[in-house]
């Protein structure tokens, strides 16, 4: 122990006496370890972290896919359930202590605290079964949790609020428990606050603000409630395994229950059964561990995190190579000192241990600095990844596993890249080292040093090429033709109370909104729609074309659709390329009409004019419902990375009266619009207050969720790609800088070692230009070898990322050419100063020194 302390004190003295070396080494390590730890922090928080609940390993989800919100016939792997089906499955699973159900897609509701809120707030609420909090083993931070007695239609309406919302929206009001809130205009009693750190069973960027009992959904959603007869599939289910029980046999028992239910008891329309029944034997249930909750962000960000992990791992390798080169150069510079100590009787093992201690100390100090870089870096990454989100339920603070990872990484770095320099330094022969201590004719950089510089150049090219590909892909995404205009367009997300308007009242409300907004001085036109392009929403439906029979119940036959007002297409800038748009003649008393996009026209009406043709939703019974009057230009509504889906549009002013209960319910629900679109003129920066006031004057109960420009709405779709591209670009620049530092150090060291040789050359007639060429040739030879190795590696890395690239090849010559030029320019900048110093050598002084 005493010897170890002596070695540590000696290492600290050595580092203190070489501040430039120490600072460079620590900065290099801090960047490499910090960036890698930051990515590991986010990976652990998003991909690996368990829910903050009791014994999460005992939780299992029934089903393992993520559906949108309702229905669920598209997948054989069944994951979405109606309330009666959930009850049937729960009863057939005795291995579970209890099974809870919860809403797959929590919605936005108008929520106001009695006597304290002047205006309602647009907050997200999730319906849960009465045993939800009990299954997760959670108590309330204040008050009590929702229980089974609350989950009754006859019970008094209650709600729980999240700890985050209680703090941020209600100022941690200690008297909030027991107060009255109005949800969609209905009074409820707030009975409790959820524990800190619990954001629901799904890790998402918009977690619930409130939780409501499942069976009270009918109170708030009225005629649109999912709990009414003809139940749709809209719930997820999670069960808690009994101690000692196993889930292995459970899927085989639950699958027949599901199939019997779908065949005999599911309240699907009779005319739909002939198409559905043949697919029932293919339906099955799978159970998956649910300790991490329902995967949402895991699915969304998994690929990006893997790319960033590879990028940071590469950056760490470059940083380690730089550190090893610094240690090798430092060991070579101390050859004479090492020789003296060996001549005086110092043991080689002691010298190795001392230099290894110095490397380990550097690594530990660099790791501590890296934790600071990791904390800041993780916060920066969260800000970039969730730029459009108001809240992110992910902690940027490194957890204990992350701290252990950083510590282990630091030690590993010190051992791997400290052993070789220490061993090489200890091999010095005292007589040889002392004889050449003052000579300037040493051979120069060693082979390991050259290999490290070549490795840095190769890996830097890989990072630069990857960053270039990701940046070019992002540019292609943002500059593509979306099929609509974003300039001077504004979107407003609204939430009209579902049970407050009859269809007649809705028509009057919509006319008042359009007329009131158009009267504003900076508004040229206004329209309404169920949802606007690239807003994260999608309505899907099967369609049947007149004369072609029933559609099959597969996703491939599904299309998207929207319900829009007459001015919609001109307001958003989506052109009608054939036929006409909606007009005054398309009223509630005229024949139902539709406009289809080019993709739907190509798919269902190839080689014929779709205008004048008829189609309907769901099945052939309704195939003559809508007459196509126009074809709209293809536009991207769902995924900007994919081609436009087939899509049709229905006029907001028309309704169809269906004999089928489910179809009629959908018809009513889709008349509640969620989006207003505006075409503005002039400066729109100060328009939001005017818009809010105008809408409040029309209907004070109309909840406004967001007001943003169309360009902002579109840009929010690329937050993840932007984060990856910006971080990869930053890491690529850092890698190039580290490679330049390594090349500069090696070139300067080589020049210092060859001072006498340079003096001899100049004495024999070599001019300064020849000396500069000599030095640059040696430096560029190393870089050229690095490029030869790095180009195939970069091509391979591009192929690994191909799925993340948009309209760019994984070996794009422009990107690769720019990366090579950038690395070459950096190498030239790193080599020119040592070359200039070599050319400025005084031959007499150099020879006299020798």
What is each PLM-predicted segment?
Residues 19-46, 50, 319-320, 363-367, ...:
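Short, strongly hydrophobic transmembrane alpha-helices
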Residues 51-106, 236, 268, 477, ...:
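Membrane-proximal extracellular/periplasmic loop immediately following the first transmembrane helix
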Residues 124-148, 156-303, 379-383, 466, ...:
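Mid-to-C-terminal secondary-structure elements
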Residues 319-363, 741-780, 787, 834-837, ...:
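Interfacial "coupling" helices/loops that link adjacent transmembrane helices in transporter permeases
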């Amino acid at each position: 122990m005493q010897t170890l302390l002596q070695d540590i004190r000696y290492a600290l003295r050595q580092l203190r006496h070489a501040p430039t070396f120490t600072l460079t080494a620590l900065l290099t390590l801090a960047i490499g370890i910090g960036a890698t730890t930051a990515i590991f922090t986010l990976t652990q928080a998003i991909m690996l972290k368990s829910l903050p609940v009791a014994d999460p390993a005992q939780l299992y989800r029934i089903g393992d896919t993520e559906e949108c919100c309702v229905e669920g016939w598209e997948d054989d792997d069944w994951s979405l359930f109606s309330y009666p089906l959930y009850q049937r499955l729960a009863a057939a699973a005795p291995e579970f202590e209890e099974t809870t159900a919860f809403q797959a897609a929590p919605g936005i509701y108008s929520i106001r605290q009695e006597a304290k809120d002047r205006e309602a707030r647009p907050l997200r609420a999730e319906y849960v079964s009465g045993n939800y909090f009990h299954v997760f083993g959670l108590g309330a931070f204040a008050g009590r949790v929702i229980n089974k007695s609350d989950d009754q239609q006859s019970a008094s309406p209650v709600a729980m609020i999240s700890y985050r919302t209680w703090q941020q929206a209600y100022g941690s009001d200690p008297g909030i428990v027991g107060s009255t809130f109005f949800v969609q205009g209905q009074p409820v009693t707030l009975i409790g606050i959820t524990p800190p750190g619990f954001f629901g069973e799904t890790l998402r960027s918009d977690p619930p603000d409130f939780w409501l009992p499942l069976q009270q959904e009918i109170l708030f959603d009225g005629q649109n409630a999912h709990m009414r007869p003809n139940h749709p599939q809209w719930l997820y289910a999670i069960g808690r395994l009994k101690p000692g029980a196993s889930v292995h046999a459970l899927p085989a028992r639950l699958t027949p229950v599901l199939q019997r239910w779908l065949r005999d008891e599911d309240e699907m329309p009779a005319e739909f059964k002939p198409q559905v029944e043949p697919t029932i034997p293919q339906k099955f249930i799978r159970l998956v561990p649910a300790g991490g909750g329902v995967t949402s962000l895991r699915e969304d960000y998994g690929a990006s995190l893997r790319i960033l992990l590879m990028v940071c791992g590469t950056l760490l390798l470059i940083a380690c190579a730089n550190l090893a080169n610094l240690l090798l150069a430092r060991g070579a510079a101390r050859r004479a000192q090492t020789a003296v100590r060996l001549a005086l009787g110092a043991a080689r093992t002691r010298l190795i241990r001392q230099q290894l201690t110095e490397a380990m100390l550097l690594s530990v100090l660099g790791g501590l600095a890296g934790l600071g870089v990791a904390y800041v870096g993780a916060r920066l990454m969260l800000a970039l990844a969730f730029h459009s989100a108001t809240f992110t339920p992910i902690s940027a603070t490194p957890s204990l596993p992350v701290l252990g990872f950083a510590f282990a990484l630091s030690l590993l770095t010190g051992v791997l890249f400290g052993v070789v320099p220490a061993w090489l330094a200890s091999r010095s022969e005292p007589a040889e080292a002392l004889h050449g201590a003052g000579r300037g004719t040493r051979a120069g950089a060693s082979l390991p040093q050259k290999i490290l510089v070549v490795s840095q150049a190769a890996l830097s090219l890989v990072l630069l090429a990857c960053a270039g590909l990701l940046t070019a892909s992002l540019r292609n995404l943002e500059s593509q033709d979306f099929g609509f205009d974003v300039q001077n367009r504004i979107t407003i997300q609204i939430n009209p109370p579902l049970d407050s308007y009859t269809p007649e009242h809705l028509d009057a409300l919509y006319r008042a909104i359009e007329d009131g907004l158009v009267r504003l001085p900076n508004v040229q036109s206004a329209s309404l729609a169920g949802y606007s392009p690239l807003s994260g929403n999608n309505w899907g439906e099967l369609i049947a074309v007149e004369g072609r029979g029933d559609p099959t119940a597969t996703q491939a036959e599904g299309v998207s659709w929207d319900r829009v007002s007459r001015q919609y297409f001109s307001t958003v800038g989506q052109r009608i390329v054939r036929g006409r748009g909606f007009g005054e003649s398309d009223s509630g008393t005229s024949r139902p009409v539709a406009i289809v996009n080019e993709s739907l026209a190509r798919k269902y009406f190839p080689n014929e004019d779709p205008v004048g043709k008829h189609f309907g939703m769901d099945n052939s019974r309704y195939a003559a419902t809508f007459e196509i009057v126009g074809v709209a230009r293809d536009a991207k509504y769902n995924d900007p990375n994919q081609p436009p889906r087939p899509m049709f549009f229905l006029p907001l002013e028309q309704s169809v009266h269906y004999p089928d209960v489910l179809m009629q319910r959908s018809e009513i629900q889709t008349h509640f619009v969620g989006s207003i679109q505006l075409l503005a003129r002039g400066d729109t920066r100060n328009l939001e207050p005017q818009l809010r006031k105008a809408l409040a004057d029309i209907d004070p109960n109309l909840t406004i969720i967001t007001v943003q420009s169309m360009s902002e709405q579109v840009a929010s779709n690329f937050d993840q790609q932007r984060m990856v591209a910006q971080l990869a670009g930053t890491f690529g620049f850092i890698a190039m800088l580290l490679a330049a530092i390594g090349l500069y150090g090696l070139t300067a060291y080589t020049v210092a070692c060859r001072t006498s040789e340079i003096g001899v050359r100049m004495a024999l007639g070599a001019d300064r230009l020849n000396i500069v060429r000599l030095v640059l040739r040696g430096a560029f030879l190393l870089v050229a070898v690095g490029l030869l190795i790095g180009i195939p590696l970069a091509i391979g890395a591009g192929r690994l990322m191909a799925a993340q690239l948009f309209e760019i090849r994984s070996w794009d010559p422009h990107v690769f050419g720019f990366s090579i030029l950038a690395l070459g320019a950096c190498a030239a900048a790193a080599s020119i100063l040592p070359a200039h110093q070599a050319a400025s050598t005084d031959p007499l002084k150099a020879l006299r020194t020798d």
